[in-house]
């Protein structure tokens, strides 16, 4: 944050190097046989929308365009403002991951036909089994008007008991 204001040219040069290296790495992943790519932008929410549009969106486009036609591509931008989600959906990705701050009803209305993934707060997996089941079922019941991939709204926390992750998986698989 702030790098682009003071060192705009250098910030763009840095992003260019990052995207070039990442693109090369992801192409190797495809060559080695991955079935899907998922890009996590865990710091997306730290930038104001105008800076995200300047310093991130053009580079995401450069990264996604040559790959999304070859392999399914999921983009997850944690903390992204709702005003930017429709722009992300137009980058050519096959699905958008949502964190727990995005309202599922709003997302389905704003992004018709877009496959959505998420958005259970990972901290719920630290709760009791009853809470995990309840929160997971609630999440699943809210994603009814779109193609959907059940998942957490960010990465699993290191201290999450394996048994609790299994409860989440079992709840998703048994939901109807």
Enumerate the language-model features and the residues they cover.
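Charged helix-capping and loop-helix junction motifs
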Residues: 52-59, 131-135
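Surface-exposed cleft-lining segments at the edges of enzyme active sites
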Residues: 8-18, 45-50
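Active-site-proximal loop/short-helix segments
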Residues: 1, 30-55
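Alpha/beta enzyme core
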Residues: 9, 19-37, 57, 61, ...
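Glycine-rich anion/phosphate-binding loops
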Residues: 11-24, 127-134
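Short, small-residue-biased leader/transition segments that mark boundaries at the very start
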Residues: 2-7
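Catalytic-face loop-and-helix region of soluble metabolic enzyme cores
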Residues: 68-176
